[in-house]
Structures are given as C-alpha cells and as structure tokens.
Amino acid sequence: MILLGSTGSIGTNALEVASHFDIPIESLCAGKNITLLNQQIAHYAPKNVCIADKNDAHKLINGNYKLFFGSEGILEMIESSHSHLLLNALVGFAGLKPSFKALQCNKKLALANKESLVNAGWLLQNADITPIDSEHFGLWYLQNNRPITKLYITASGGAFRDYPLDKIALATPQEALKHPNWQMGYKITIDSASMANKLFEILEARWLFDIESIDAFIEPSSSMHALIEFADGSITTHISTPDMKLPIAYALDKDKAAQMPFIQPLDIQSLCLALKNIDTLRYPLWNLKDTLLHTPQKGIVLNASNEIAIEAFLAQKIPFGHISALILAMMEYFDSFKFASLCDLESIQAFDNQVRAVSSQWLERKIKE
C-alpha cells in the first residue's frame, strides 16, 4: 500500500488496519512529524519515503528506502511505487494532484482528502474512488442499488455546538480545538466548529453519488452517520460507534472488513439519538449549502479562503468569527466568475491561487482595522 499522510489520525489508523489485513506498506509520505515517521519506518520498512521539507532529511533514521521530497516528490513516489492501493490522507489542496496521479497510474484510490472532490469533483466524478469518511461510508453501505430520493449526513456540531452564541465570534484556537466527540487534526477540528467540514462533505456526496438532493443534521452523539430516503418512501440509517477504523477497513479490503469486528458494537438500549437542524446563526457558513450544491465548482472558493483563514486563526492573527466572514466575503466577490471555464487541473490551480491572493488581502485589511 501507498500511504500519503501517514502520521495524521487517518494515517495511523490506516496502518493499524493494514497490519490486521497483512497489507505490506510500500510507500509512506508525511509532513513535519519526523519522530512518528521514524517509528513507522522502523516498524513497516517501506521501500519509499517522502517528506515535506528536504531540510528534515537529516532527522530520518537510516534504512533501505528511497527518499523523496515535497509536492513533486509525492508524485514521483506514486509513479515509482508498484502497489495497486493508494490511501490519500493528505490535508488540504495539497492532496489534489496526488489523487489525479494515483488514478493516472491505475491505482485504487482510497480517499480521505476531502479537498480532491471539493476542488475538482467534476473531473473525478467517474473515477474509481472509495471514500474514507464515516458519512460517505455510511451512504455507500446503505444504498444497495435502490432508487434514491435524498441523502442525509450528520454533523457533531463541533466545539461550539453548545457554546454561548455571543462568544463564538471572538473564540480562540484553544477553544475551537475542543471537539466534543473526536480526536482529529487541527484543520478538520476547526472545520467542524465552523461547519465548513460538513459543506465539504455535502460536495463530496454530490460527486460520489451523483445527486443534488443532500442535507445534513446535527446528531450530537456522532453515532448516526448517514440516512438515505428512497423512492419507495422508506428511510434507512447507518449507526455505529464513532471510529474511523470501520470506513478505513472497508476501503482497504471490503471482503475482509465484513468478516472482522473493527469497532465495539453500540449498546442499542442506551442510545439517545436526536437530529437537530443546523442553525445558521451559530454556523453562518451553512447559508452556502444550496449555492454550493447548485454550483459545486464554488467549492474552490470555499476551500481556498478557508485554508487562508485557518492559517491566520491558528497563528492567532484573527478571531474565530473572521473565518466565516472571509469565506462569505470571497463567495460574494467571486460570484460572477465563469466557473464553467474550470475544465482541467491547471485552470483549477490558477483560480485557487487567485482566491488565496484576494483572501490574504482581505485578511490584511481586517487585521489592520
């Protein structure tokens, strides 16, 4: 297996599942957590290793592996790897080109990088992709080739689900990172607090299941992951212990996954499930759901401005409320852009750069106010 993003929460879980399935690890890619990467190299003995920064090379342990660097190094490593299975758990726009390279090299793509579909779903719509996400796994698990009327996914509500409404706008990174149910990376935890993550997942579902009728609810326990309303009027739901090992296992080997208990079963009698509407006063980004489903190419604006905002937020340059404010401002600014012109990776990259530049200028003005 080729694993991109091996030191993150998805990556470490994927390695654990791969060990259960006796899947050898041919290639590992990681960012700045060299200490954990060294442990993985020692344990899994990969033939290829890629790190983000060449200056970190001296920190790596010795081994019989070929070393690659940076974004171009990821693409080179994919090309030189013989494994048929690639799991992309990179964070952000950086995961887009590796997804395309994997498919160009006829790899089976297990996709945890949401931004690949958010930024270029129309170019990937007919590709062989297995999503690694509890919500999309739940939808896949339920669909069973029956005619579908509507898809529903659930949200935890993030760190500010029960937070005083008047204090959210000025919240700090420390407060935004207190997720009630999951232990995840910084970016996805903040995306959960702002509801940007659920917008990403709505767009993913749009491309994966080729349907525009999609909605989401808050389900505080994170035990109910997805619901499908079928043409016959019935609704089914996928309920399980919140544990990413289950969707990862099915993405790596669905036949083996169906035979092995990777998660603890829920105590059904103790379940207390409630579906709540997503309040746009608490989550102003949720106002974008319909426009994104209607023009999903606008996901590029959502993603690029969000990444710029989160970088500034984590650096404590802006309060939490500026994340939504920036994204909403950029969606309005680029509303008249000819999104139909985004027909290849080059045009998507150029537009992404443009959105980032305008977003940075907007933030600079805000910071000076």
Curated annotation (Swiss-Prot):
Cofactor(s) essential for the protein: Mg(2+); Mn(2+)
Molecular function as annotated in GO: 1-deoxy-D-xylulose-5-phosphate reductoisomerase activity; manganese ion binding; NADPH binding
Keyword set includes Oxidoreductase: yes
SUPFAM superfamilies tied to this protein: 1-deoxy-D-xylulose-5-phosphate reductoisomerase, C-terminal domain, Glyceraldehyde-3-phosphate dehydrogenase-like, C-terminal domain, NAD(P)-binding Rossmann-fold domains
Enzyme Commission code: 1.1.1.267
Residues annotated as binding NADPH: T7, G8, S9, I10, G31, K32, N33, N113, E115, G185
Positions contributing to Mn(2+) binding: D133, E135, E201
Domain of life of the organism encoding this protein: Bacteria
Catalytic activity: 2-C-methyl-D-erythritol 4-phosphate + NADP(+) = 1-deoxy-D-xylulose 5-phosphate + NADPH + H(+)
Binding of 1-deoxy-D-xylulose 5-phosphate, residues: K114, S134, E135, S156, H179, S192, N197, K198, E201
InterPro entries: DXP_reductoisomerase, DXP_reductoisomerase_C, DXP_reductoisomerase_N, DXPR_C, DXPR_C_sf, NAD(P)-bd_dom_sf
UniProt keyword list: Isoprene biosynthesis, Manganese, Metal-binding, NADP, Oxidoreductase
Gene3D superfamilies, per database record: 1.10.1740.10, NAD(P)-binding Rossmann-like Domain
Top class in the EC scheme: oxidoreductase
Pathway listed: Isoprenoid biosynthesis; isopentenyl diphosphate biosynthesis via DXP pathway; isopentenyl diphosphate from 1-deoxy-D-xylulose 5-phosphate: step 1/6
GO biological process entries: isopentenyl diphosphate biosynthetic process, methylerythritol 4-phosphate pathway involved in terpenoid biosynthetic process
The keyword Nucleotide-binding is assigned to this record: no
Purpose: Catalyzes the NADPH-dependent rearrangement and reduction of 1-deoxy-D-xylulose-5-phosphate (DXP) to 2-C-methyl-D-erythritol 4-phosphate (MEP).
Family to which the UniProt record says this protein belongs: Belongs to the DXR family.
HAMAP family in the record: DXP_reductoisom (MF_00183)
Protein name: 1-deoxy-D-xylulose 5-phosphate reductoisomerase
